[in-house]
Curated annotation (Swiss-Prot):
Residues 340-365 are annotated as: Disordered. Belongs to the drug/metabolite transporter (DMT) superfamily. Plant drug/metabolite exporter (P-DME) (TC 2.A.7.4) family. Residues 340-356 have a biased composition (Polar residues). It is found in: Membrane. Residues 27-157, 223-329 form the EamA domain. GO terms for cellular component: plasma membrane. The keyword Membrane applies. This is WAT1-related protein At1g01070. Keywords: Membrane, Repeat, Transmembrane, Transmembrane helix. GO terms for biological process: seed development. The keyword Acyltransferase does not apply. GO terms for molecular function: L-glutamine transmembrane transporter activity. InterPro entries: EamA_dom (IPR000620), WAT1-related (IPR030184).
Length: 365
């Protein structure tokens, strides 16, 4: 019996870590595939709109069946909150992120997203959702150092390509022409990095905003479904920035259709629900610490599935990123242990002091 209880505690302790790892590994594969779809020439916000619509359709039955008895009543304020959530975490974020992805590569996009823990941590300190005093503790210093190492690994991977260490040859989807756009993409490389950075900041703001929203509206399936519905319409409006041709919405390329469905189901519905749950469990800073894994996942997916060359810089940068992530989680674990020990000590103190008060009140005068 005691062994079963201990097993349950272990599962409860590590389930957020397992879920966040799986979620971000999946996101790495989504980013690599979406990059290939963008190279075909599809309007990036058309991909975003379809992706959000598919996410909403997938989540409707889950929200209805699993949360119909626990779902709070929708108020106008909650509708506005989900509209803002859709802007920060989906439509505007995708507008800048996919635009930057079209100018750069899946590896670079994931590398810049790897700075999410640092940005979220800094914003959390600014908005006071993280305590400034933790910087004076060992756990706090481990989190800061781990975050800085994550950033270093991401920057190393981005700016140091290094020699090719594999014999794989780049493989691209048939019918897509890359040669004519190579020079344009090289010229817009810095602009693409700027767009990706803006997208990462928006994603950080969404994670902090979602931390508050998940308390007011704790139904993760319904919340993600509402967010996806609003974001689908927002993406459709933002698509007018690039083109107003109705034919852009007609997609007959099977590869692109497959990527959009995969991105909607896995990259939006599943990962957003998982991230929302992770934020609710252990906070926005904790959830953001796993985003560097998308970098490693995208690099491996490019190499093993899409057969793009593997470079030394990618390997070294990935190893440095993993080291930083491990240090951050180490610090987070120490912080959790300290909080648990403190609360246990307070409970024990209350347990011992309460009987004394009762005895004093019953003692004769």
């Amino acid at each position: 019996m005691a062994g079963d209880m201990q097993g349950v505690r272990v599962v409860e302790k590590y389930s957020p870590v397992i879920v966040m790892v799986m979620s971000n590994v999946a996101m790495g594969s989504v980013n690599a595939l979406v990059k290939k779809a963008l190279d075909v020439g599809v309007n990036h916000m058309v991909i975003g709109a379809y992706r959000m619509a598919i996410s909403a359709l997938i989540l409707v039955p889950f929200a209805y069946v699993l949360e119909r008895k626990t779902r709070p009543q929708i108020t106008f304020r909650l509708m506005v909150d989900h509209f803002v959530s859709g802007l920060l975490g989906a439509s505007l974020m995708q507008f800048f992120f996919l635009l930057g992805l079209s100018y750069t590569s899946a590896t670079v996009s994931c590398a810049l997203v790897s700075m999410l823990p640092a940005i979220t941590f800094a914003l959390a300190l600014i908005f006071r959702t993280e305590n400034v005093k933790i910087l004076k503790t060992k756990a706090g210093m481990l989190k800061v150092i781990g975050t800085l190492i994550c950033i270093s690994g991401a920057l190393f991977l981005t700016f140091y390509k290094g020699p090719q260490i594999s014999n794989s040859h780049s493989h691209s989807h048939g019918g897509a022409s890359h040669n004519n756009n190579d020079q344009d993409k090289a010229n817009n490389w810095l602009l693409g990095c700027l767009y990706l950075t803006i997208g990462t900041v928006l994603l950080s703001l969404w994670m902090l905003f979602q931390g508050t929203l998940s308390i007011k509206y704790p139904c993760k399936y319904s919340s993600t479904c509402l967010m996806s519905i609003f974001a689908a319409f927002q993406c459709a409006l933002l698509s007018l920035y690039k083109s107003r041709d109705v034919n852009d919405w007609i997609i007959d390329d099977r590869f692109v259709i497959t990527v959009i469905i995969y991105a909607g189901v896995v990259g939006q519905a599943m990962t957003t629900v998982a991230t929302t749950w992770g934020i609710k469990k252990l906070g926005a800073v904790f959830a953001s610490a796993f985003f560097p894994l998308t970098l490693i996942s995208a690099t491996l997916f490019d190499f093993l599935i899409l057969h793009t060359p593997l470079y030394l810089g990618s390997v070294i940068g990935s190893l440095v990123t993993i080291t930083g992530l491990y240090m951050f989680l180490w610090g987070k674990n120490k912080e959790t242990e300290s909080s648990t020990a403190l609360s246990s000590g307070m409970d024990n103190e209350a347990q011992y002091t309460t009987p004394n008060k009762d005895n004093d009140s019953k003692s004769p005068v």
